[in-house]
Structures are given as structure tokens and as C-alpha cells.
Amino acid sequence: MNDRQTVPLFPLGLVQFPGTLTPLHIFEQRYRQMLEDIQEGDKTFGIVYRQADGLAEVGSLVHVAIARPLPDGRSNILCFGTTRFRLFRVIEDDETPYARAEIDIFEDDPAFDSLEEESTALRDLFARLITARRRLEGQPEGGPIEELEDASDVADDPQLLSFFIASNLDVDLSLKQRWLEMTNTALRLREIHRQLADLVGEYEKKAHIGRISKTNGHGGHPHSH
């Protein structure tokens, strides 16, 4: 189904996924105008990754959930990704100081098999990553972990789960863009699982080395001096 529409376009050095929140600081005059314009309408614009060789072909629509204007005209906003689009045509003319784009909305292809097993495995691996990361950062273990609670909120939707975990991984933006462009949910889950397994191995190794160094190379409790 063709669902072409025209939206304000905001090229950025990030990859926005549906179902995820992104804070932005609006300071350029043209984007101040964009924010003013969309606040009068549906509060929606498109974010597309600005690559070294131009704009990516796929981006995400976002809804401005919170907008906090500052006294000097700048604003801090919080955007929520809603759906993906393919760029059909970028429009740069005198009608607005910012670019607009004709876009086509799209979703993942229908999945005929249950992806519950893949989703559970990915969620469990993500929990290990967060735990190891917290250890490395010296945060106390136990208690609620916001990222895992957020992952549980989208656990029943493999597509949203894949987007949520992808957005939380410290990987190259070109890889995130690849995942954003995929339309096969199962394939995206598998690719993210492979990447996540590598990251978990690295983090758990660093966390283990960190624990050993705190005990001066001995097992047991850290020495007190």
C-alpha cells in the first residue's frame, strides 16, 4: 500500500528507531521554525541519518512528546519514534527554511512463524549485557533496571523489541541503519543477537577483570585499607 506524504525533514548524525525516545536540542533558526510549524499541527517530523556520502534512504517519523522552550529561543524536545519511511524525494525550496521530504511509510514483512524463542533469547542476552555494564560502571546490583523494564514492555512485539535493543547497543551507526532498513524481523533479531553476543562477551570479560583488580588479584572480598 502506498502511503506517501510530505513531512519536515531533520537530517542528524544518529539513527532513530520506532518505539524509542530521543532528546534533541533545537538551536538552528530553521529548525526553530520547523518546531513552531509542527507544534501547530501534528507535532511530527522525519529524522534521517546524515551519512558521509549523503542522506540515508530510510528514516523514522517522530512525534514531539515534550517541548521545553528556553528564554533565548532554543528548545529542548523529547521525540518518540513512531514508524519508518523511505525517502522518495527531498524538497528544498522557498516555502520553508528547512527541508521537507515526500516519504513512503513501510513496515516489516508479515512473520508466519512465531518469533517468541528468538525474542526471549535476545532479551535474556540483553539482560546479561546490562548487568555487566552496570558492574563496569560500579552501579549497585539488584533493584529495578530501567532498560530491562522497557524491554519487557515491548517483549510481545518482536519488531519493537529488535528496535529497542538495537537503539541501546554501542555499535557503528551504519550497522544500526542496516537494521532499520531491514524488513525481515527474524533476520534482524538474528543479526542483533550475533552482535549482542560479541558485546556481552567483551563486557563480561571487562567486568571480570575489574572484579579481580579490585581484590588485588586474589579471589574473595576486596581488601580494605
Place the predicted regions along the sequence by residue.
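N-terminal low-complexity, acidic/polar interaction/targeting segments
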Residues: M1-H225
